[in-house]
Amino acid sequence: LKDGDAVQGIAYVIETYGLIYNKALLNKYFELPDAEIKSIDELNNFEALKKVADGIQKNKDELGVSGAFTSAGMDASSDWRFKTHLANLPVYYEYKEDGITSSEAIKGTYLENFKNVWDLYLKDSTCEPSMISSKTGEDAASEFALGEAVFYQNGTWAYNDIKDMEVADEDMGMLPIYIGAEGEENQGLCTGSENYWCVNKKASEEDIQATLDFLTWVV
């Protein structure tokens, strides 16, 4: 955590989020005769994601799923996945394009991309769009854990909610959230921290140094 060039804190919790996916189910889709995308290596942009999701939805009965994506619940236990995490992507690409790290208001350069991803989540889902107001985070986790959906937008912290069910650990993977931005084929996973170790600059020099020595030992 920096203020200019000055280090203000060091992260002690690193978390990553994206599209958690079921490898076994995705491979079943790749093997379909009419699959437009044939391998995970080809699934590296929004256009490919849409082809895969549409194909899964079209063949959901044959694949044994209820939908490509888990339900996009909009209650408080789930809506943050989209109002915050998904929304970070269009903001990131706008800031990157403009060469800035903050602004008083976004221009909305990538709002159409945001809408396209959200529409895909709703259209190729385990539930009808009219049901999202009643769907919860627990519903989405359960749908993925029981093998009812191929994709589940969430992060590393969700592992405890989906482990030891129908999806084996070795069948879990994570893809970046693709929104159709230029160059996203090289995009990585969204990774960061909300938790940092900091040292109180108003403490005594002795305590500051002892704390820094301790943190050096810890890390």
Predicted regions and their residues:
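A structural signal for short loop-to-beta-strand junctions that line the ligand-binding cleft
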Residues: 1-26, 184-190
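Extracytoplasmic/periplasmic solute-binding protein
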Residues: 2-13, 17, 47-103, 149
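Extracytoplasmic/periplasmic substrate-recognition and gating elements
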Residues: 126, 165-219
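Beta->alpha turn/N-cap motifs
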Residues: 137, 154-159, 177, 193-195
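Short helix-initiation/N-cap motifs at beta->coil->alpha
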Residues: 43-48, 131-146
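Paired acidic/hydrophobic, glycine-rich loop segments that form the ligand-binding mouth/hinge
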Residues: 150-154, 173
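Glycine-centered hinge/linker elements that transmit conformational signals in sensory
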Residues: 50-55, 98-134
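Short, solvent-exposed loop/beta-turn-alpha elements that line the ligand-binding surface or hinge
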Residues: 38-44, 73, 91-116, 164-166, ...
